[in-house]
């Protein structure tokens, strides 16, 4: 019995991350279904982030009551900027691009997020790069490979891949319709998704700065969602003036904000943070390509989306680039941990307890890390 318990304890992080990827895949599906029903994307964003703020706020008030720092004008401006970058720009561009392409395509493109974050952090001198080191080469090459995969998906669609549950007549009809439409829609949709990805990466960079002066994860995430809901509401009032556009019924228009607010922000935030504490951000990010596969299968079955050969090839290339970047970043964490451990062994008294050493090591690594990999401990997890 103890052996079974020990095995389940070892498997728990893997099972939890697989569960989260199913939840993330569901986000793409329900959002796409809502957009297909004609719901304005900014109305969806308002409801989604409002639900997320309501879900996170009680936990923030209870668990961070004694550790929440005082709000300053500087932190407030950063929170407003974070709410504009992630909910307004990222989700706004991402949803529009998804509507022009597909949920499968969007989930594949979004795997270049770590690469884009690396580029922005490097430009801002927040990411150290040494060409002589293998880990830096891995991050650079992985970034180029990921961008190359996105380029392949943009320029090459390729033939349709027949699936056992697909309807050949429907695939032929949809393919004919797509050929008759302006191909620029596909390119424009890709550019919009990439713009959303850049905004999301900028969000992670700014969040890594903000968390140093406001180290209350739950409170910060709740405030970001609230700021995003308020700013999205202002945009939505301009683009959607008819009251009927704000109406929700017992369909995807009601289910989408509830699902994304509770699952994508509430449950995902808690589970992701719990796994990150024991296995690190690289472990969390490494499961992202599974979401792409799940979206492709579920969307083709429920939404009758087509899967093109170019999407498969490009997605595989992007996934390869993703793993190269997270491998290089993982080596950064290992080196950082060894440096801190060596420094502590030289500066501290030789007699300490194991728990004190562990706490100092974790605290030091947290204080000296640069930009958290997307999906890490400081992730708001309320993206697309």
UniProtKB/Swiss-Prot annotation:
UniProt-listed PANTHER family:
WAT1-RELATED PROTEIN
Q: Which residues form the EamA domain?
A: 25-154, 198-326
Q: Which UniProt keywords apply?
A: Membrane, Repeat, Transmembrane, Transmembrane helix
Give the SUPFAM superfamilies listed for this entry.
Multidrug resistance efflux transporter EmrE
State the Gene Ontology terms under molecular function.
Answer: transmembrane transporter activity
What is the recorded membrane topology of this protein? Multi-pass membrane protein
Superkingdom, taxonomy of origin: Eukaryota
The family assignment reads:
Belongs to the drug/metabolite transporter (DMT) superfamily. Plant drug/metabolite exporter (P-DME) (TC 2.A.7.4) family.
Any one Gene Ontology cellular component term annotated for this protein: membrane
- The name on file for this protein is WAT1-related protein At4g08290
- Origin organism of this chain? Arabidopsis thaliana (Mouse-ear cress)
| Protein's cellular compartments | Membrane
TM spans, by residue? 15-35, 43-63, 73-93, 104-124, 140-160, 186-206, 219-239, 255-275, 282-302, 307-327
């Amino acid at each position: 019995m103890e052996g079974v318990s020990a095995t389940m304890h070892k498997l728990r992080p893997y099972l939890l991350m697989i569960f989260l990827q199913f939840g993330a895949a569901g986000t793409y599906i329900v959002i796409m279904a809502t957009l297909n029903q004609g719901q304005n994307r900014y109305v969806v964003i308002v409801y989604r982030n409002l639900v997320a703020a309501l879900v996170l706020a009680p936990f923030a008030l209870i668990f961070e009551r004694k550790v929440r720092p005082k709000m300053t004008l500087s932190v407030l401006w950063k929170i407003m900027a974070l709410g504009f970058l992630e909910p307004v720009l990222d989700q706004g561009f991402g949803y529009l691009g998804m509507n022009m392409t597909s949920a499968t395509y969007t989930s594949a493109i979004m795997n270049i997020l770590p690469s884009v974050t690396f580029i922005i952090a490097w430009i801002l001198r927040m990411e150290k790069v040494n060409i002589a080191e293998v880990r830096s080469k891995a991050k650079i090459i992985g970034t180029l490979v990921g961008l190359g995969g996105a380029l392949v998906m943009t320029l090459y669609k390729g033939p349709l891949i027949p699936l056992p549950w697909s309807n050949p007549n429907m695939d032929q009809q949809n393919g004919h319709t797509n050929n008759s439409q302006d191909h620029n829609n596909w390119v424009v949709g890709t550019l919009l998704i990439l713009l959303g990805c850049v905004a999301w990466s900028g969000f992670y960079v700014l969040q890594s700065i903000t968390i140093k002066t406001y180290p209350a994860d739950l409170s910060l995430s709740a405030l970001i969602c609230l700021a995003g809901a308020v700013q999205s509401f202002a945009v939505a009032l301009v683009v959607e003036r008819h009251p009927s556009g704000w109406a929700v019924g017992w369909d995807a228009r009601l289910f989408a904000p509830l699902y994304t607010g509770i699952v994508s922000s509430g449950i995902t935030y808690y589970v992701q943070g719990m796994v990150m504490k024991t296995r690190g951000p690289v472990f969390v990010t490494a499961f992202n390509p599974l979401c792409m596969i799940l979206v492709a299968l579920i969307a083709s079955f429920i939404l009758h989306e087509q899967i093109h050969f170019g999407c498969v090839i490009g997605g595989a290339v992007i996934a390869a680039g993703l793993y190269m970047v997270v491998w290089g970043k993982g080596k950064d964490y290992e080196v950082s941990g060894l440096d801190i451990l060596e420094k502590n062994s030289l500066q501290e008294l030789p007699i300490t307890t194991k728990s004190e050493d562990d706490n100092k090591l974790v605290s030091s690594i947290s204080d000296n890390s640069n930009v958290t990999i997307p999906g890490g401990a400081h992730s708001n997890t309320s993206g697309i």
